[in-house]
Structures are given as structure tokens and as C-alpha cells.
Design a protein with these regions (language model features):
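C-terminal helical subdomain
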Residues: 147, 166-249
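Substrate-binding pocket helix/loop in short-chain dehydrogenase/reductase
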Residues: 57-58, 65-67
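A glycine-rich helix->loop->beta "capping" turn
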Residues: 12-17, 34-48, 54, 97, ...
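Conserved Rossmann-fold SDR core element
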Residues: 15, 42-45, 128, 135-150, ...
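The beta1-alpha1 cofactor-binding region of Rossmann-like NAD(H)/NADP(H)-dependent oxidoreductases
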Residues: 20-31, 63
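Residue(s) in the substrate-gating loop at a strand-loop-helix junction
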Residues: 107
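Active-site helix of classical SDR
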Residues: 81, 123, 131
Length: 249
């Protein structure tokens, strides 16, 4: 598929190269960044979208199923960001103006929970938090960082469930790529540290964890029952954690 996409870009007058290094490997991620700089004379935009699924209930999940998913998603996002960030820092220190973008891929599973995806959800939640940290750290170098939680039908999700024609249309990746393109454009220069939900029904900002009700602390566990019950009673339910509240998309 990568070769097909590159060929299509060339047919339409663009320039494209394919790199087959493993972005979940430290040296592979660096080689990819170095190749982009070498082929195009610089690096302006990094979109992290590597992912795999190894779905299984937590108590049945194997160590390899956990490790492989977390490595591809988490390290496969962190490693390219690390090497790209070092490139942009060096550019800035050399006196060059940097106006760069990083767009990461998180998931509704990571933001709102999904049974049977402990490995995937943990990795995607980590990517969301990683994106917020990176947005703060890399802003000094002229880099914006955002993340997108897409709902799209891709090679990774085909066959997981039957979809109506309307759902297929609403899961067209074109809805997602439009937002990615906008965030990567000059218009997106002031947007950083945000996590977006994106699908054919619309775009939304996923609001992060907030401080909820508070109660006085105690070193005596016997005093905590009523206090914890009170703050739970006045707290909001974790957003979207009950799948019955999700849009049927």
C-alpha cells in the first residue's frame, strides 16, 4: 500500500518516497527522519499513525500481545517524535525559523475505554498524554503537537463489525485526513496541545481529566467511607465510559 500511495502522489505531480524502517525501533525511527530530511531538504510535518491490534480480554492476554501493541503504538510514536524534535531543535539553534507540526493518532478506546482492548487502550491513552507533554516541551522550538482520535474504516478495522452504508460513509478516512491537513497547514499554527475526535459526524475537542469534588484528607481509613462516597456522589461520570452513551457510529 505504501508504494501504491507514493505512486499516486507522483502521478499527480508530487514527490514521494517510501521508507520501510520499523518506527518502533530507535534506529529505524531515526533513519526515517534522516531520509525525509535528505530527500526533501528538511522536515516540516510528522504524522504518527503506526498501529496494530491484538484484542483479547485482560485475563486472557499474553505478554507478547501486550508488549507488541504497546511497542508499536507508544514507542512507534515517541521515537519519531524524539528524533524529529532533535532535528527541529538543531535547526532553531542554527538560527533557522522553525514552523513545524506533529499530529499523533490516539483513539476513542484510549480516551473512553473499550472492553477487550486493554493493551490498545492503554497505549492510545498514553499517546494522548504524551502529545500534551510534547506540546509544552516542543513549543519553544516552534513545533505544535496535537492528537486525533479517529473513527475510520481502515485495513486494521475491516471485518470487526458489520456497518450500514451510512456508517461506512461516516467512517471514510477522508474526514480524518481533512483535519490532519488543516492542522498541518499555516492556519493550524496556533493550535497545540489539543486532542480532537474526528469522524464523518463532525469534529470535537476531547476535554481532558478535570479536578472534581474534593474532601478533607485523613490518616484514619475508618473516616474515609462517608467522605469518598460524598465526592463520588457529586462527581461527573467518566466521559463516555459507558458504551451505551456512545453514538452509534
Amino acid at each position: 500500500p505504501a508504494e501504491e500511495v507514493a505512486a499516486l502522489i507522483r502521478e499527480r505531480g508530487g514527490k514521494a518516497v517510501v521508507d520501510t524502517h520499523n518506527v518502533a525501533e530507535w534506529a529505524g525511527a531515526k533513519a526515517m527522519v534522516d531520509k525525509a530530511v535528505s530527500e526533501f531538504g528538511g522536515l516540516d510535518i510528522l504524522v504518527n499513525n503506526a498501529g496494530i491490534l491484538r484484542d483479547r480480554m485482560l485475563i486472557n492476554m499474553t505478554e507478547d500481545e501486550w508488549d507488541s501493541v504497546v511497542k508499536v503504538h507508544m514507542k512507534g510514536t515517541f521515537a519519531p517524535m524524539h528524533h524529529a524534535g532533535n532535528y527541529w531543535r538543531a535547526q532553531q539553534k542554527a538560527g533557522k525559523k522553525v514552523d513545524a507540526r506533529i499530529i499523533n493518532t490516539t483513539s476513542h478506546s484510549g480516551l473512553f475505554c473499550n472492553i477487550g482492548q486493554a493493551n490498545y487502550a492503554a497505549a492510545k491513552a498514553g499517546i494522548a498524554s504524551l502529545s500534551l507533554v510534547a506540546a509544552r516541551e516542543l513549543s519553544r522550538y516552534g513545533v505544535t503537537v496535537n492528537a486525533i482520535a479517529p473513527r475510520a474504516e481502515t485495513r486494521m478495522t475491516q471485518g470487526l463489525r458489520e456497518l450500514t452504508p451510512e456508517q461506512v460513509e461516516r467512517r471514510d478516512p477522508a474526514w480524518i485526513s481533512a483535519l490532519v491537513t488543516w492542522l498541518a497547514s499555516p492556519e493550524g499554527a496556533k493550535i497545540s496541545g489539543k486532542v480532537f475526535e474526528a469522524w464523518g459526524y463532525g469534529y470535537a475537542v476531547a476535554e481532558s481529566w478535570q479536578h472534581g469534588p474534593i474532601t478533607p484528607a485523613s490518616k484514619d481509613p475508618s473516616e474515609l467511607g462517608p467522605r469518598v462516597e460524598e465526592i463520588i456522589r457529586f462527581s461527573r461520570k467518566n466521559a463516555g465510559i459507558d458504551r451505551d452513551t456512545w453514538l452509534d457510529i
